[in-house]
């Protein structure tokens, strides 16, 4: 190879390498920005305002209310609920972070279990947090758990806000129970 051909080869190689580095760094910045966004930006500051929790799927529902500093199952004769389980749920919801946009196509939402709860064969769960005046603080459709997710917690769920079309992979460990026994205070 001549000196000129060799020089052109190395310049092209250098340009391709620089282009690849720039492309990768731009992509990682976008992913970082999204992953830093919380699903509900101000929820952590408003947790004390939550007075009602409603959880439902196509077949079951759990309703909780805060009465005299205790959480009760309003649909179960105001039976006292486990403070630990309620606080765990509220904290988990407030810490959920958007990791990656998944789909906006309505026909794909059932695969992630984030379709409308009222639809036939729906496997999604609707979580609604309300204040003392019955005003919605946060509302989220919670889908299936993500498998083998990388990240700080290694845990994730597919989620979608009911008024939005886009389903997201959210980072965080959120367990939503529709079994009354999981909510009962063991005392």
Question: Can you name each region flagged by the protein language model?
Answer:
Residues 1-187:
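Soluble, acidic/polar mature domains that operate outside membranes
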């Amino acid at each position: 190879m001549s000196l000129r051909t060799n020089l052109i080869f190395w310049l092209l190689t250098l340009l391709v390498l620089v282009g690849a580095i720039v492309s990768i760094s731009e992509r990682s910045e976008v992913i970082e920005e999204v992953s830093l966004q919380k699903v509900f930006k101000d929820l952590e500051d408003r947790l004390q305002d939550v007075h009602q929790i409603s959880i439902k799927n196509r077949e079951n529902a759990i309703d909780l209310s805060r009465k005299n500093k205790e959480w009760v199952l309003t649909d179960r004769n105001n039976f006292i609920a486990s403070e630990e389980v309620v606080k765990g749920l509220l904290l988990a919801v407030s810490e959920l972070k958007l990791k990656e946009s998944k789909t906006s196509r309505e026909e794909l939402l059932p695969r992630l279990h984030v379709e409308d709860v009222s639809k036939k064969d729906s496997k999604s769960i609707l979580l609604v947090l309300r204040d003392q005046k019955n005003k919605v603080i946060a509302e989220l459709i919670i889908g299936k758990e993500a498998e083998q997710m990388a990240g700080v917690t290694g845990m994730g769920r597919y989620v979608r806000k009911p008024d939005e079309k886009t389903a997201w992979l959210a980072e965080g460990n959120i367990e939503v129970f529709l079994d009354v026994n999981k909510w009962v205070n063991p005392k």
